[in-house]
Amino acid sequence: MKKNLLKSLYFQVLLAITIGILLGHFYPELGTEMKPLGDGFVKLIKMVIAPVIFCTVVTGIAGMESMKAVGKTGAIALVYFEIVSTIALIIGLIVVNVMQPGAGMNIDPSTLDVKAVSLYAEKAAEQGIIAFLLDVIPASVIGAFASGNILQVLLFAVLFGFALHRLGEKGKPIFNIIDGFSHVIFGIINMIMRLAPLGAFGAMAFTIGKYGIGTLVQLGQLIVCFYITCILFVIFVLGTIAKATGFSIFRFINYIKEELLIVLGTSSSESALPRMLDKMEKAGCQKSVVGLVIPTGYSFNLDGTSIYLTMAAVFIAQATNTHMDIVHQITLLVVLLLSSKGAAGVTGSGFIVLAATISAVGHLPLAGLALILGIDRFMSEARALTNLIGNGVATIVVAKRCRQLDEGKLNEVLNAK
């Protein structure tokens, strides 16, 4: 029993995170030097994301009997994404108004370090809706794979899958090659995942060493408020959706616990993407559904990021005594419904989208972003965890709606001890 526990990736990552926290707290300088371990692990994962998405989507689409099924899957997924992410935005808005974590801080925006957020503001200015849509189309296929842009690779994979399906029997040899290549890629992923504890240790040691546990106290109310909101969202909103679909959210969380710990250690939901594709297939979801829903969800179904965006924006207003009436808050909500859809397509993710939103709304002081900058790293864990759970639930829901779910298989893996 003890030997099996030590071999468990779940236990190894949990132990690594604990050691990382202790090292960062007691030896901060040494902790900050561990950063390359976390960065290296995330880079290794990103290295295989593009090929794994390509193989999964192409074999999933090309292997389907009807092309109408692909269109139906995509349409159901997008409707689901829009509804659930809107609920997440509204919940974030309600909680931050009720709890008011920024009230009483009385911060003068002119005293904040504008230089600290200028880089994010510049990137945000480039991130318009038209620019985002055009960015989905790669300048070249090789460029899409080289940059690791998920949506660009996904677009090419969908087109490739459709074209391969139309070839019929002539395309069978190509299909077999890609299917075989996908097995090789998943073999590489299994090797990389052995380094997950090392990556989680390095990332956590750096975070605590650089920012310190004590720095959280001043802005801790927002962090606590955000974490509680994410937990309630997962339990009640995603839990209700899961129950209506016929499974338990708690059993599902237990099923993906290793992936959640990897995300917790690295603060990157991308680090678990390849394993999630494999796990969702093993849970009874058809490959074609998994290949479309999971990668697309990384840009269109970011529940944790949606909660973060509304809470952070209103927090800045409260902290700087900027009055936001119902009209301003509805405007903020509408802008976020559009801007939040590009959150995973930009470097810096949620923070840059937040800067873009504040610039678009115009009512909030852009300098107020400096308040969030210092604690953004600590909020990223809850964002990434909520995003991962949300995309997993979405995959099962869409698979069931499209009649592409083996419910017997799902119950078997979720109830396994």
UniProtKB/Swiss-Prot annotation:
GO biological process assignments: L-aspartate transmembrane transport
InterPro entries on file: C4_dicarb_transport, Na-dicarboxylate_symporter, Na-dicarboxylate_symporter_CS, Na:dicarbo_symporter_sf
Record GO cellular component, one term: plasma membrane
Keyword field contains Cell inner membrane: yes
Pfam families, alphabetized: SDF (PF00375)
Membrane-topology annotation of the record: Multi-pass membrane protein
Taxonomy, superkingdom: Bacteria
Record carries keyword Membrane: yes
Chain ranges passing through the membrane: 8-28, 44-64, 76-96, 142-162, 184-206, 222-242, 326-346, 352-372
Keywords: Cell inner membrane, Cell membrane, Membrane, Symport, Transmembrane, Transmembrane helix, Transport
Subcellular location, principal: membrane
GO terms assigned for molecular function: fumarate transmembrane transporter activity; malate:proton symporter activity; succinate transmembrane transporter activity
Subcellular locations according to the entry: Cell inner membrane
NCBIfam families: PRK01663.1, PRK13027.1
PANTHER family for the chain: AEROBIC C4-DICARBOXYLATE TRANSPORT PROTEIN, PROTON/GLUTAMATE-ASPARTATE SYMPORTER
Family indicated by similarity: Belongs to the dicarboxylate/amino acid:cation symporter (DAACS) (TC 2.A.23) family.
Function: Responsible for the transport of dicarboxylates such as succinate, fumarate, and malate from the periplasm across the membrane.
Protein name per Swiss-Prot or TrEMBL: C4-dicarboxylate transport protein
Organism of derivation: Photorhabdus laumondii subsp. laumondii (strain DSM 15139 / CIP 105565 / TT01)
